[in-house]
C-alpha cells in the first residue's frame, strides 16, 4: 500500500470510528506560535492553570513528545446537541460534559485507529493524545485543514461549527499534509460581544483567568472572585456562550455518539435539586463524567456563587 492509499485508509477508518474529520500536517517547530504563547503566559492569561507554563518547548515541538515524529494526524469528534436541561432556571452545564468523559471515549477510538494503522502499515511508532500532554491541538488541526482559529480561540469548521473535541496521533509515518484552512471570521465579533465576563480581551486572545470555564472548573479556590458575581450567566460547569452565538454553529450536525448522551436524571434536575445536591447523587450522576474534575465541593461552590 503506497503513502496516498495509507492516507485514505486512515481517513476511512477514522470515519468508521465516528470521527467527523481527519487531517494531516507535517511535524515542525511552531515558530509563529512561540511568541504568541510566550506573550499569553507573560500576561498571566493562564490564570490558575500553572501547568500551561510547563513544557514550553514540548508544546511547540512534537519531536520532543514522539521520537522521529513526522506527521500529526488531527481528528474531530462532534459533541453538538440541541438537548437542554428541562428547567430554564437550573444552573447550566456545558454541552461537552453532558455524557461520559470525552477523554475515555476518544482514547478508546484513537487506540483502535492506531492499532489499525500498525496492522495495515507495519512497524510504525505513534502516540495518541486527547488533552493528555502539552500538544497545541487547535494549531495542528488548523494546519491539517480541519478549520480555522476563531476569535474566541475555538477551532471552527465551515460545515460543523465548533462543537467538537480535537485529538491527535503523532507518528513517525510520513504522509502528505493537507494544508491549512483560511480564516472566515471576517468582521464578526459576536463571541467577543457576548462573553459574560469579557474574557475575550482581543480577537484571538482569551484571558483564561476571566473565562467562566476556568472559574468553574480549573480554579480551586474555596470562593470564586467577587468581581464575577452576577456575571456567570448561571453556568455551574463550563460555558458555551461564545460558541452558542457563533453563526457557524448553525451548520453543526447533532452528534450520534451514544456515550455522549445525557441521562434523563441529569436533564430533569431543577434549580432546587441542584441547590440541594448531595454527594451521593453527585457520584451517581457524574461517575464517568468530566464534571468530576471540579469535584463535589467545587460544584457546590459554583452553585452557591450563582445565587
Regions found by a protein language model. Name each.
Residues 16, 190-216, 220, 232-259:
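Iron-sulfur cluster-binding cysteine motifs and their immediate structural context
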Residues 1-184, 233-234:
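Auxiliary alpha/beta "docking" domains used to position bulky ligands
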Amino acid at each position: 500500500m503506497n503513502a496516498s492509499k495509507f492516507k485514505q485508509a486512515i481517513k476511512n477508518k477514522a470515519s468508521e470510528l465516528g470521527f467527523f474529520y481527519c487531517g494531516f500536517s507535517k511535524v515542525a517547530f511552531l515558530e509563529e506560535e512561540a511568541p504568541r504563547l510566550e506573550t499569553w503566559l507573560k500576561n498571566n492569561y493562564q490564570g490558575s492553570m500553572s501547568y500551561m507554563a510547563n513544557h514550553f518547548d514540548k508544546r511547540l515541538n512534537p519531536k520532543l513528545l514522539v521520537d522521529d515524529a513526522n506527521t500529526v494526524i488531527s481528528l474531530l469528534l462532534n459533541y453538538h446537541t440541541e438537548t437542554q436541561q428541562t428547567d430554564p432556571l437550573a444552573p447550566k452545564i456545558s454541552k461537552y460534559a453532558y455524557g461520559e468523559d470525552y477523554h475515555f471515549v476518544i482514547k478508546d477510538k484513537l487506540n483502535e485507529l492506531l492499532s489499525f494503522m500498525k496492522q495495515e502499515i507495519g512497524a510504525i511508532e505513534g502516540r495518541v493524545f486527547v488533552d493528555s500532554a502539552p500538544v497545541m491541538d487547535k494549531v495542528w488541526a488548523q494546519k491539517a485543514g480541519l478549520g480555522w482559529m476563531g476569535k474566541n480561540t475555538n477551532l471552527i469548521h465551515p460545515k460543523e461549527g465548533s462543537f467538537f473535541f480535537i485529538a491527535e496521533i503523532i507518528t513517525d509515518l510520513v504522509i502528505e499534509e493537507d494544508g491549512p484552512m483560511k480564516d472566515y471570521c471576517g468582521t464578526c465579533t459576536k463571541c467577543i460581544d457576548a462573553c459574560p465576563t469579557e474574557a475575550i480581551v482581543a480577537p484571538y486572545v482569551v484571558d483564561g483567568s476571566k473565562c467562566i470555564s476556568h472559574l468553574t472548573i480549573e480554579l480551586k479556590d474555596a470562593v470564586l472572585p467577587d468581581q464575577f458575581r452576577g456575571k456567570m450567566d448561571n453556568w455551574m460547569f463550563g460555558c458555551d456562550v461564545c460558541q452558542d452565538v457563533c453563526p457557524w454553529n448553525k451548520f453543526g450536525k447533532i452528534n450520534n455518539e451514544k456515550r455522549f448522551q445525557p441521562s434523563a436524571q441529569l436533564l430533569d434536575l431543577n434549580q432546587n435539586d441542584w441547590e440541594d445536591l448531595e454527594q451521593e447523587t453527585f457520584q451517581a450522576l457524574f461517575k464517568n463524567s468530566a464534571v468530576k474534575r471540579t469535584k463535589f465541593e467545587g460544584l457546590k461552590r459554583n452553585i452557591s456563587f450563582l445565587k
